Amino acid sequence: MPHMVALAVGRDPLLLETRGRVLRNAGYTVVSALSVEQALQSFVSRDFEIVILCHSLPRRDRERLTYAIHAHSPNTPVIVVTARVSAMDSFADAMIENEPEILLQEIPRILHQAPEKYQREPKRA
């Protein structure tokens, strides 16, 4: 797998640190953000292959952040990690269970499910 950079966003510092450690141990570079504003600042300052939103963010914040990311970079997938997958956040590209093994299995699948959608293109200015 080529080197991947992920943006992980959530309000719970412990969950965010744990998720970041899991991703780093799997070879990802991880930038973490504790708020929508911090996430947007990070997102516009560098390229990310994927954005991972934690269920600890309120739904309206997940939605707002997803739309902002897709407006800036339509081909960057946004996934929501949740305690239980029952209802899809219709704005997200995927929702997955909050299990490290599932997260690590699903990221490559999401990136390869529609390669033409997620191929890197320059971010909009």
Predicted region positions:
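Conserved phosphotransfer microenvironments
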Residues: 53-69
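Residue-level detector of anion-binding/catalytic polar loops
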Residues: 29
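Acidic, metal-coordinating helix/loop segments flanking the phosphotransfer/catalytic sites
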Residues: 32-50
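Non-catalytic signal-transmission and effector/linker regions of two-component phosphorelay proteins
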Residues: 1-13, 85, 100-125
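Alpha4 helix (beta4-alpha4-beta5 surface) of REC/receiver domains from two-component response regulators
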Residues: 59, 64, 76-105
